[in-house]
Amino acid sequence: MEPFADALFWVGAVTVLWLSVSSLWSLINGIRVWILGNGNLMRASSLGKWAVVTGATDGIGKAYAEELARRGFAIVLISRTQEKLDEVSKAIESKYKVETKTISADFGSVDIYPKIESGLAGLEIGVLVNNVGVSYSYPEFFLNIPDVDSFINNMININIMSVCQMTRLVLPRMVDRSKGVILNVASASGMYPVPLLTLYSSTKAFVDFFSRGLDAEYKSKGIIIQSVLPFYVTTKLSKIRKPTLDIPTPERYVKAQLSTIGLQTQSNGYLPHAIMGWVTASLLPAKLLNKYVMGMGLSQRARYLKKQKQG
């Protein structure tokens, strides 16, 4: 029995040592990311004059445009409605005293990229924020989605094609200059399957994998590419208006997220969201999480349909 007991002792000792080292490293890394941060990286003086933001007139996109302008970047605002673009552009120029440029484009279409390429020609772009996105009006079974064929095309064009094409347009000049940051705003919904939002969740999983793969490809070229995976933020897309500790305003979220750049390839961007991401993706069994998310979706779907029926 002694050899067996000795073996058990060493297995236990190595396990305790590994857990201790792992816990210590997690603590040190957490302090580095969430307390010390890397806020000084995101400056026009170190990356390049211009920051390009898609979906820039509302929510997280607008918050990125404003915060990057505050840090000294000139801003290219890309969104669908010229009137909203002009309004945000004027406000940013007035408040932050930086140059702006607007490009109106409907990312639901695939023929917009020559226009965008022309609008970006000659600009020294230090930052690209691929933020534009679309979700479901309400949770629904895949085959029950109204006009599902059009829905599929629109969501893929906006959530996936925009990220690929905007990266294609901007990345070459970043590589030439050996510096630049690309932030691809995915969603915590891309960390695991979300039944009844299946297509949306899948597009965000694509954005996450695309970002992490490209970061590995171009890190040696001096480029940072980060996958940003927020949980709920008070935006039109989330339909939540009242901020809480775990549901921040876009402004609060963006300020926190920008401090993680260069420290995390894949980031929830905000400490409460990082804790939620760790619990849901690492601690909860997949079957239990799937059951919980499905139940939540069914409840939201029932409330929406009841409200629609009542008129």
Curated annotation (Swiss-Prot):
Cellular component terms per the entry's GO annotation: endoplasmic reticulum; endoplasmic reticulum membrane
InterPro entries: NAD(P)-bd_dom_sf (IPR036291), SDR_fam (IPR002347), VLCFA-Steroid_DH (IPR051019)
Sequence intervals crossing the membrane: 8-28, 125-145, 269-289
PANTHER family: RH59310P, VERY-LONG-CHAIN 3-OXOACYL-COA REDUCTASE-B
Catalysed reactions, as listed in the record: a very-long-chain (3R)-3-hydroxyacyl-CoA + NADP(+) = a very-long-chain 3-oxoacyl-CoA + NADPH + H(+); 17beta-estradiol + NAD(+) = estrone + NADH + H(+); 17beta-estradiol + NADP(+) = estrone + NADPH + H(+)
Enzyme class, broadest EC rank: oxidoreductase
Key words of the record: Endoplasmic reticulum, Lipid biosynthesis, Lipid metabolism, Membrane, NADP, Oxidoreductase, Steroid biosynthesis, Transmembrane, Transmembrane helix
Pathway annotation from the record: Lipid metabolism; fatty acid biosynthesis; Steroid biosynthesis; estrogen biosynthesis
EC number: 1.1.1.330, 1.1.1.62
Topological relation to the membrane, as annotated: Multi-pass membrane protein
Binding-site list for NADP(+): 48-77
Catalytic residue list: 200 (proton acceptor)
Chief location of this protein within or outside the cell: endoplasmic reticulum
GO biological process, one term: fatty acid biosynthetic process
Function as written in the Swiss-Prot or TrEMBL entry: Catalyzes the second of the four reactions of the long-chain fatty acids elongation cycle. This endoplasmic reticulum-bound enzymatic process, allows the addition of two carbons to the chain of long- and very long-chain fatty acids/VLCFAs per cycle. This enzyme has a 3-ketoacyl-CoA reductase activity, reducing 3-ketoacyl-CoA to 3-hydroxyacyl-CoA, within each cycle of fatty acid elongation. Thereby, it may participate in the production of VLCFAs of different chain lengths that are involved in multiple biological processes as precursors of membrane lipids and lipid mediators.
Chain positions recorded as substrate binding sites: 187
GO molecular function term, any single one: very-long-chain 3-oxoacyl-CoA reductase activity
Protein name: Very-long-chain 3-oxoacyl-CoA reductase-B
Subcellular location: Endoplasmic reticulum membrane
Family designation: Belongs to the short-chain dehydrogenases/reductases (SDR) family. 17-beta-HSD 3 subfamily.
Domain of life of the organism encoding this protein: Eukaryota
